[in-house]
Curated annotation (Swiss-Prot):
InterPro entries, alphabetized: CENP-T/H4_C, Histone-fold, Histone_H4, Histone_H4_CS
Function: Core component of nucleosome. Nucleosomes wrap and compact DNA into chromatin, limiting DNA accessibility to the cellular machineries which require DNA as a template. Histones thereby play a central role in transcription regulation, DNA repair, DNA replication and chromosomal stability. DNA accessibility is regulated via a complex set of post-translational modifications of histones, also called histone code, and nucleosome remodeling.
Compositional bias ranges of the Gly residues kind: 1-14
PANTHER family per the UniProt record, alphabetical: HISTONE H4
Name recorded for this polypeptide: Histone H4
Places the protein is found: Nucleus; Chromosome
Disulphide bridges: none
Chain intervals for the UniProt region annotation (Disordered): 1-20
Length: 103
């Protein structure tokens, strides 16, 4: 093993990536029809055109808060993988208890 720790053969520990995809405007991946479907599931009949950007902004803030908390739980447990329970605990901490995913 030659002192590489838990990582095994050291695969995936290479240098800097030459071509790294720049992540921006991913929130636009939440398409207008997807937002419309979610609204329909919630019982909405008609949707104003100004709603879509507003929903994207609110959703982005909500997910950032959940992910930030989840990563905090993961780092505290000295893990590198975010588990479903990290998400459940993050949601519970923010007052949105989710059932059906263990715990």
């Amino acid at each position: 093993m030659s002192g590489r720790g838990k990582g095994g053969k050291g695969l995936g520990k290479g240098g800097a990536k030459r071509h790294r995809k720049v992540l921006r405007d991913n929130i636009q991946g939440i398409t207008k029809p997807a937002i419309r479907r979610l609204a329909r599931r919630g019982g909405v009949k008609r949707i104003s055109g100004l709603i879509y950007e507003e929903i994207r902004g609110v959703l982005k803030v909500f997910l950032e808060n959940i992910i930030k908390d989840s990563v905090t739980y993961t780092e505290h447990a000295r893990r590198k993988t975010v588990t479903a329970m990290d998400i459940v605990y993050s949601l519970k901490r923010q007052g949105r208890t989710l059932y059906g995913f263990g715990g």
